[in-house]
Amino acid sequence: AYRTEGALKATKVIWSEANAEIASSGLYFPQAGFPYIKINHIEVSNGKLYASAMHTGDVTIGNVQWKGIYMNIFDFMYDDLISAGIFSLDVSALDNAESVAQIGVKTQLGGDQMGVEGINFTTEGNSIYLCFAAKGTLTFTYQNGSEDITLAFDNTNGMVEHAFITTAIQDGKATTKIFHADSHDNGASYNSIGKMQIEGNTLYIGGTFHQMMPFDNKLTHVGGCDLFVTALDKNSLEAQWTAQSGLDEGNGDTQHFNENFTSMAVNNGEVSLYGYVLQDENEKTFTKS
């Protein structure tokens, strides 16, 4: 953190490391760059710095500990499963860490490739609104409780549900709504939450989706995946409307073409989405409003 004149104010180091028992098992062969923690969004509200992150391995944030979850592959090897969370720090000195929310696969050393695919959040006063994309059976833990989230998962036939879960956290209590979609057998994680923003009584969420749109099951992606924006009532979390880009960028499975979310802006109820597509290594930028 820096002061307004540019002087360094405080530094906070956050790290992830493999669970000691897993690391010494002789069955753990991490991929390059694993374990990790990747912060994707930060906001300041009421004297606190909030951050959302995806992680593998055990994460240490001051006194906060997020445990890594691992997959047992036929008792032959252990692999990292992706978890996510939101934490806060006092903005003045980046201390007094608190875990606001943490999401991870429910079963440690289970045999299925489950996990979190994306997370984001926004704040309003003392309220925190978050949304995450996920698959499988997960445990969602917040300050005053926890709940299990069970999504359709047929590992035998490869049919997996990729859902969006939206939550409002107020005074440590969570109100959660799951937006379901039909299962499919494409393992690629094209569902993402790129940005969230509140204007008036509306919570806007932008990102990408693949196959059936969880916020509006009448919509289906075109090409590899689609940009989307959805408007929710911030009090009930009910969906009001959802729009998609509808750009046919090519087949994301065979040609590796897919839309990538970069930003979203909301002004008096008008929403603009920004993203790009990489085709034959040539970047093509497009805008939808």
Where are these regions (language model features)?
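A sequence-level/structural motif corresponding to short, flexible coil/turn segments enriched
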Residues: 1-289
